Regions:
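ATP-dependent carboxylate-amine ligase
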Residues: 1-37, 42-50, 62-66, 82-87, ...
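Fold-independent oxyanion-binding glycine-rich loops
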Residues: 8, 30-31, 69-71, 92-93, ...
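Phosphate-binding loop of NTP-binding sites
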Residues: 19-23, 57-58, 70-220, 226-237, ...
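A conserved, hydrophobic alpha-helical segment in the catalytic core
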Residues: 20, 175-189, 228, 262, ...
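Beta-strand->loop->alpha-helix junctions that form or flank phosphate-binding loops
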Residues: 51-54, 90-97, 135-138, 234-252, ...
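The start of beta-strands in P-loop NTPase/AAA+ ATPase cores
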Residues: 132, 154, 180-181, 216, ...
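Short polybasic amphipathic segments
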Residues: 254-259
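Short pre-catalytic strand/loop immediately N-terminal to key active-site residues, enriched for Gly-Thr
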Residues: 264-269, 317-321
Length: 450
């Protein structure tokens, strides 16, 4: 099969390209720019385009299917050529569904935690040598790619993103998967550029629940009232399995899970991660992993990439980075670090980087998100606001949104970096939360602070 990727450089797209290349398909692709790690990984498999840009001559009748990435625009010249020739065009999730129609589809959804839960499940299955197909949104230890597709595996585990499928298919990705087994971890308003109200956003999870296969199993976080309302009121003929935060305690900076077999030390921490663990346990049981085998394997799970990831640590200081950027994630991450390192000063730094977080109307959602920190810092780039074609937000608007009088706000990368490297980190927990890079922050240099 000949497959062409329009926007091959995306995190998910390049991993799918590699997975299909490994499956023996002939792969080509284009993009106007590709950054690492996508660039070096595509190069490793000889899939990196020889030059960047869009080239309609790449689209011929010899191509069986074009996979269209969200980064491309509706007027992309390669897309227009494919439409003109009548070449089959599909979105990323549409293609994944086509590849998994005959498998048991396990889909992990939710505004937060879906990458971590998917990663936990894959870690457990890998630990016990159980082969499954998968698609996950982060690089995992022990897994070469973020996408794996075979003919023979019975299960496929899919991270169910609620963002749109492609420029020509405006359905949320997770609406296309039609799961046999599903999970919803939580609902907190996000992606306001496509879901302008919370009710509109919440409706997408109702549609997801209703899209499940008749007789399927829904695992859900019963402590999230929006999730519970949607699942428990669903008239779809599905089995419902609620979960909640398991019993645990923290001793000397280590979180212990209370089980019938004794107290189990974990490498992860935070109430949100313990909820994630409870959800992953239910899913694994549906996939044939019993409770004892789950506990044996979860003890060695250290977290998904960029999720409360330790950059550096010594006996009195820890530096962490986290992908948190939405209000609910920022709040959960800040509270988790505060509870885990109670006797240390907590410095919490947040970069406002996404479309939603830089939107003046959405900023109020961050009220109280950094309250658990001893020292709270926000960095944002006015240039990023300009690129996203949003109205500029002022420091006063940000201060008002967080409702914290001592909030430190930086808009200049050098000033923020100077502040950071000027801190005395003795007996401190420093957490850096962003989906960006703080204007080019040198994380390797940051390690030298302790």
């Amino acid at each position: 099969m000949n497959i062409h990727f329009i926007a091959i450089g995306g995190s998910a797209m390049h991993n799918l390209a590699i997975a299909l290349h490994q499956k023996g398909y002939t792969i080509s692709g284009s993009d106007d720019t590709i950054h690492d790690p996508s660039k070096s990984r595509l190069k490793k498999y000889n899939l990196l385009p020889t030059e960047f840009g869009w080239f309609p001559e790449k689209i011929t009748n010899a191509i069986d299917v074009v996979i269209l990435g969200m980064h491309a625009k509706k007027d992309n010249i390669e897309l227009l050529k494919a439409q003109e020739l009548g070449v089959k065009i599909v979105s990323y999730p549409e293609f994944l569904y086509e590849q998994s129609k005959d498998k048991t589809r396990v889909v992990i959804g939710g505004s937060h935690g879906k990458t971590t839960i998917t990663s936990m499940i894959l870690h457990i299955l890998n630990y016990h040598d159980k082969e499954v197909d998968y698609m996950v949104g982060a690089q995992l230890d022990g897994f070469e790619t973020m996408v794996h597709l075979t003919e023979e595996n019975d299960f496929i585990v899919l991270e169910g993103d609620e963002y749109l499928s492609s420029p020509t298919d405006l359905r949320p990705k997770f609406h296309l998967y039609k799961p046999n087994i599903a999970l919803i971890s939580g609902i907190a308003w996000d992606h306001i550029n496509v879901f302008p109200t919370f009710e509109n956003y919440k409706e997408q999870f109702k549609i997801f629940t209703d899209s499940m296969i008749n007789g399927g199993s829904m695992v859900y976080n019963s402590e999230d009232r929006n999730v519970a309302e949607i699942v428990e009121s669903s008239e779809n003929h599905i089995k419902k399995y609620p979960y909640e935060t398991p019993n645990h305690f923290i001793d000397n900076g280590i979180t212990y899970l209370e089980t019938e077999e004794g107290d189990l030390p974990l490498e992860i921490f935070g109430k949100h991660n313990l909820q994630n663990l409870a959800g992953a346990k239910w899913i694994c049981q549906h996939m044939g992993i019993d409770e004892d085998d789950f506990y044996e394997a979860i003890a060695s799970f250290s977290g998904a990439s960029k999720r409360l990831e330790k950059i550096s640590e010594n006996s009195e200081t820890v530096i962490l980075k986290d992908f948190a950027h939405s209000p609910s994630k920022v709040s959960a991450t800040t509270k988790a670090v505060s509870e885990q390192y109670k006797n240390r000063t907590l410095i919490a730094c947040l970069e406002l980087h996404t479309y939603s977080s830089l939107n003046a109307e959405f900023l109020s959602e961050y009220h109280g998100a950094l309250d658990a920190a001893d020292k709270a810092v926000v960095f944002y780039s006015p240039h990023a606001v300009e690129i996203k074609q949003l109205e500029q937000v002022s420091k006063a608007q940000i201060a008002n949104a967080f409702q914290r009088d001592d909030l430190l706000i930086f808009t200049n990368p050098k000033e923020f970096h100077d502040f950071l490297f000027g801190q005395d980190l003795k007996s401190t927990a420093l957490v850096l939360m962003s989906s960006g890079n703080y204007g080019g922050l040198d994380f390797e240099k940051l390690k030298s602070l302790i």
